[in-house]
């Protein structure tokens, strides 16, 4: 069972943050997480982020603990 994302954000908020950031890797992370919020698979999120499933899992854990920063 995948780790669920925190409920105080949504896909559109993360996409807006991704558009505003000047940090390319952060934008990819945010877009990958937005895809998960939209119901996409972790595999699809990994493709968007250009990373492995383990990295996506790490992103989810960090995002749940610290938010989008």
Question: Where are these predicted regions, by residue range?
Answer:
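Short, basic alpha-helical/linker "hinge" immediately adjacent to a nucleic-acid-recognition surface
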Residues: 1-69
């Amino acid at each position: 069972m995948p780790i669920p994302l925190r409920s105080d954000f949504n896909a559109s908020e993360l996409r807006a943050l991704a558009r505003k950031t000047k940090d390319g890797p952060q934008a990819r992370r945010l877009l990958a997480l937005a895809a998960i919020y939209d119901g996409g698979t972790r595999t699809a999120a990994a493709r968007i982020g250009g990373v492995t499933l383990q990295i996506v899992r790490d992103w989810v854990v960090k995002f749940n603990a610290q938010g989008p920063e």
